[in-house]
């Protein structure tokens, strides 16, 4: 999770298209399942059924004063950033990799969301917490389009973007045909 959080952090702070492509390529070069999850997240193909903005507000109200959060959110203007900064870190746990964390969240039942998801948020660093909230709400807004991801993959594997686009809609997680 630390590596993916770092990737998103670098992507959002990088204005250069070519630098973003290089960052994506460096991440996708790794031969592990995390790159498949990263691709699913960056191409908006991953969603969580029970974790929405309203649920996150409910959870944060259990952790901090509602007025303090509301004032902070008004000032910051971004839900994920506000929650990641104001959420009390109880203990920073051992960093899980992206795939393990996502699989653990997918296993959470609706009745367990409040306790289990709160515990997960409490164990993450601010940057990891921000990343997880962005993933769960589906609103990354980091300056990376699906086309940019395709361009990075095409350059990485010496293919044309058209070749990637031809197979794109037929791909299924974990994207073995692509990687």
Show the residue positions of the predicted features.
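N-terminal nucleic-acid-engaging modules of covalent nucleotidyltransferase systems
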Residues: 1-179
